[in-house]
Amino acid sequence: MKKLTEKEIREELNKMKGWSLKGNVIEKTFLFHDFKEAVNFLNKVQPIADSMNHHPDVCIYYNKVIVQLTTHDAGGITDLDVELAKKIDELLT
């Protein structure tokens, strides 16, 4: 696991649609038709996060899911956060 510099983070985010840097986290908001779809999405994220032993912070607001990624042990964003973000995006392609 490698902690990324701000430049490295921005370079990665430029390749990823919808993700942004917010302080010490990368964040993306996902919109769904309703609450059930939002929960189903998180049910798909869970096994991926578990397999990586890396878990996002999430908030659900009816049909909106906000996902935040950071590596607390590293004190910032690492390659693991970027990898998980890409895998989460793949769920919707």
Swiss-Prot record:
Molecular function terms from GO: 4-alpha-hydroxytetrahydrobiopterin dehydratase activity
Keyword Nucleotide-binding belongs to the record: no
Matching InterPro entries: PCD_sf, Pterin_deHydtase
Record Gene3D superfamilies: Transcriptional coactivator/pterin dehydratase (3.30.1360.20)
One GO-annotated biological process of the protein: tetrahydrobiopterin biosynthetic process
One Pfam family of this chain: Pterin_4a
Secreted found in the keyword field: no
Enzyme Commission identifier(s): 4.2.1.96
Keywords from the named record: Lyase
Catalysed reactions listed for this entry: (4aS,6R)-4a-hydroxy-L-erythro-5,6,7,8-tetrahydrobiopterin = (6R)-L-erythro-6,7-dihydrobiopterin + H2O
Signal peptide: none
PANTHER family: PTERIN-4-ALPHA-CARBINOLAMINE DEHYDRATASE
UniProt family annotation: Belongs to the pterin-4-alpha-carbinolamine dehydratase family.
Name of this protein: Putative pterin-4-alpha-carbinolamine dehydratase
The organism's taxonomic lineage, starting at the top: Archaea, Thermoproteota, Thermoprotei, Sulfolobales, Sulfolobaceae
